[in-house]
UniProtKB/Swiss-Prot annotation:
InterPro entries: Amino_acid_transport_2, Hydroxy_aa_transpt, Thr/Ser_transpt_TdcC. It catalyses: L-threonine(in) + H(+)(in) = L-threonine(out) + H(+)(out); L-serine(in) + H(+)(in) = L-serine(out) + H(+)(out). The lineage of its organism: Bacteria, Pseudomonadati, Pseudomonadota, Gammaproteobacteria, Enterobacterales. Its main location: membrane. This is Threonine/serine transporter TdcC. It comes from Escherichia coli O45:K1 (strain S88 / ExPEC).
Length: 443
C-alpha cells in the first residue's frame, strides 16, 4: 500500500461514525423527549385513527428537515466556534442578533407558563384522585410548587443540572415501559369508530383541521432546537478542519436523522399505545380536564371497577409520579434557558450591554421575580394547555426552527447552494401552518 493510500485509509477511518456522534445522537434525542410529549397523544388521538396515521407519516420529515435547516444556518457562519446569535449577526447585522435573542427568549418563556399550568394540574389531580385528599386552593398549590422550585434553583442550580441529566434516560425508559405495559389493556374502540362513509376532510373536527393542529403539537413535542447551535459548534470543531464544511454538514444531517428516528419511534409508539388503551372520547376528556395523558391514564386505572391487577395499580401511581418528575425536569431545563435569555435582554436594553453596571446576582433576582410571577399568574388562570401550545409555544418555535433558516437560505450568500430545493418548501409550509394556528385560535 502506498503512502497516499495509507493517508486516505486513515482519514476514512477517522471520519467514519465516532463515539462522539453516538453521544450527540442520544443527546439530541434526550433533549426532545420531555414533558411536551405527554400532550402529543391527546392532540394526536383527538381525531381518531386516521389523523394519527397521517401524523405518523409526517412525524419524521417534520423532525428531520426542520432541524437540518436550522443546523445548516448554524453551519453557515465563518467562525467554526460561533453560535447561532453570532451567525445571524454575521448575515443580518446587529438587528438580526437582537431578533434572535428575542425569539429565543419568547420561544422558551411560554413553555414555562405551560409547565406551570401542567405541574399545578398534575399535582392537584394526584392529590385528589390517587392520594384521596380533599381539594386544595389552586392559587396556593401553584405558589407552593413555584416557590419550591425557586428555592431549589436558587440554592442548588448546579446539582439540579446534574440531576436533570441523570433523569433523561430513566424518563425515556419509563415512557417505553409504560407503552409496553399498556398493551394488555389495548382495545379496538379507536378502530371501531372509523366510519369511512362519515369522514369529513374539512370542518371543525375534520381530518385536515385535526392534522393541521397536530402539526403544531409535533413541532412542539419533536423539538431539540435549543441544543442545535451547541451541537453544530461541537461538530465543526471536531470535523471541519480535517474534512471540510460539506462533510461536516453531511455528518450533522446524519446525526439529526438518527436522533429524529429514535424520537419519532418512542413518541409515536407511546401515542399509539395510549390511543389503543383509551379512545378519542377519552382524549377529548383529557383535553377538557387540562391534564397530561399520564395523569389521565392514572385516573383511568383508578376508576376501574372490579378487582384490579397489580399492573393496573402500579400504572395508576407510576403514571402520575412519572408525569410529575417529567414536568419538573422540563421546567428546570427551560427555566435556565429563560433566565439566560431574560438576563441578556435586561442587560442589553436596561444597561446598554454594560456588564459592570449590574451584578449577576441582581440580574438573576430581577429575572426570577418576573419569570416566577408571570408563571404563577398563568398557572392560577389555568388556560387550556393545548390551546397555549398551539397559539403561543409552537408558533414561536416554528419561526425559529423553520422560517428563520428559510429566510437565511434565501438571503445569505453562504447558504445559496441550498436554494430551490423541495425540502425548503416543505419546511416553509410547516412553519407557516404552525404560525397560522394563531389566526385559527382567534377566529
Amino acid at each position: 500500500m502506498s503512502t497516499s493510500d495509507s493517508i486516505v485509509s486513515s482519514q476514512t477511518k477517522q471520519s467514519s461514525w465516532r463515539k462522539s456522534d453516538t453521544t450527540w445522537t442520544l443527546g439530541l434525542f434526550g433533549t426532545a423527549i420531555g414533558a411536551g410529549v405527554l400532550f402529543f397523544p391527546i392532540r394526536a388521538g383527538f381525531g381518531g385513527l386516521i389523523p394519527i396515521l397521517l401524523m405518523l407519516v409526517l412525524a419524521y420529515p417534520i423532525a428531520f428537515y426542520c432541524h437540518r435547516a436550522l443546523a445548516r444556518l448554524c453551519l453557515s457562519g465563518s467562525n467554526p466556534s460561533g453560535n447561532i446569535t453570532e451567525t445571524v449577526e454575521e448575515h443580518f447585522g446587529k438587528t438580526g442578533g437582537v431578533v434572535i435573542t428575542f425569539l429565543y427568549f419568547f420561544a422558551i418563556c411560554p413553555l414555562l407558563w405551560i409547565y406551570g399550568v401542567t405541574i399545578t394540574n398534575t399535582f392537584m389531580t394526584f392529590w385528589e384522585n390517587q392520594l384521596g385528599f380533599a381539594p386544595l386552593n389552586r392559587g396556593f398549590v401553584a405558589l407552593f410548587l413555584l416557590l419550591l422550585m425557586a428555592f431549589v434553583i436558587w440554592f442548588g442550580k448546579d446539582l439540579m443540572v446534574k440531576v436533570m441529566s441523570y433523569l433523561v434516560w430513566p424518563f425515556i425508559a419509563s415512557l417505553v415501559l409504560i407503552s409496553l405495559s399498556l398493551i394488555p389493556y389495548w382495545n379496538s374502540a379507536v378502530i371501531d369508530q372509523v366510519d369511512l362513509g362519515s369522514l369529513s376532510l374539512t370542518g371543525h373536527d375534520g381530518i385536515l383541521i385535526t392534522v393541521w393542529l397536530g402539526i403544531s403539537i409535533m413541532v412542539f413535542s419533536f423539538n431539540f432546537s435549543p441544543i442545535v447551535s451547541s451541537f453544530v459548534v461541537s461538530k465543526r470543531e471536531e470535523y471541519e478542519k480535517d474534512f471540510g464544511r460539506d462533510f461536516t454538514e453531511r455528518k450533522c444531517s446524519q446525526i439529526i436523522s438518527r436522533a429524529s428516528m429514535l424520537m419519532v419511534a418512542v413518541v409515536m409508539f407511546f401515542a399509539f399505545s395510549c390511543l389503543f388503551t383509551l379512545s378519542p372520547a377519552n382524549m377529548a376528556e383529557a383535553k377538557a380536564q387540562n391534564i397530561p395523558v399520564l395523569s389521565y391514564l392514572a385516573n383511568h386505572f383508578a376508576s376501574m371497577t372490579g378487582t384490579k391487577t397489580t399492573l393496573a395499580i402500579t400504572l395508576e401511581y407510576a403514571a402520575s409520579i412519572i408525569a410529575l418528575v417529567a414536568i419538573f425536569k422540563s421546567f428546570f431545563g427551560h427555566y435556565l434557558g429563560t433566565l439566560e435569555g431574560l438576563n441578556g435582554l435586561i442587560l442589553k436594553f436596561g444597561y446598554k450591554g454594560d456588564k459592570t453596571k449590574v451584578s449577576l446576582g441582581k440580574l438573576n433576582t430581577i429575572s426570577m421575580i418576573f419569570i416566577m410571577g408571570s408563571t404563577w399568574v398563568v398557572a392560577y388562570a389555568n388556560p387550556n394547555i393545548l390551546d397555549l401550545i398551539e397559539a403561543m409555544g409552537a408558533p414561536i418555535i416554528a419561526s425559529l426552527l423553520c422560517l428563520l433558516p428559510m429566510y437565511a437560505i434565501r438571503k445569505a450568500p453562504s447558504l445559496a447552494k441550498y436554494r430551490g430545493r423541495l425540502d425548503n418548501v416543505f419546511v416553509t409550509v410547516i412553519g407557516l401552518l404552525t404560525i397560522l394556528n394563531i389566526v385559527y385560535k382567534l377566529f
